[in-house]
């Protein structure tokens, strides 16, 4: 005998899509593919681990892994110039995002499209979150750096 949940999955009426939980990272990967993005240039990092996982496993999305974020942005710019299509860039938190800026600026100056996605640390490990516990004293850093 089938369980109710199994029979609903088999019905084909979209029940599964409407009632299943989905990670935000998987939603981002789905969004990119639905918008026609087929290539992503990325550097893996702890702050973007869920994005790395989702993008790397997404069918229809080809990921090219680089050793530096600047290379990712420059590769996305070159990809757009050669293929006349937008590419995505995925980098990790903090310096990962700022390292990509030179390549992003190069694309921006020539109106070359690219979509840059960066990871983010948990909010409860940030200095902004911790200020509520210090009577307003500014904190430079806490937790993840």
Region locations from a protein language model:
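N-terminal alpha/beta PP-like core and its mobile active-site loop of ThDP/TPP-dependent enzymes
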Residues: 14-145
């Amino acid at each position: 005998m089938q369980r109710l949940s199994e029979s609903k999955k088999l019905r084909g009426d979209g029940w599964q899509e409407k009632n299943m939980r989905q990670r935000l990272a998987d939603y981002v990967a789905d969004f990119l593919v639905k918008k026609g993005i087929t290539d992503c240039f990325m550097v893996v990092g702890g702050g973007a681990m869920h994005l790395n996982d989702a993008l790397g496993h997404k069918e229809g999305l080809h990921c090219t892994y680089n050793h530096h974020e600047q290379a990712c942005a420059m590769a996305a710019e070159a990809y757009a110039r050669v293929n006349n299509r937008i590419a995505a860039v995925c980098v990790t938190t903090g310096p990962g995002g700022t390292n990509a800026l030179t390549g992003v600026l190069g694309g921006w100056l020539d109106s070359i499209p690219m979509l840059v996605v960066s990871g983010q640390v948990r909010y409860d490990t940030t200095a902004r979150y911790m200020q509520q516990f210090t009577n307003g004293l500014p904190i430079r850093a806490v937790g993840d750096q």
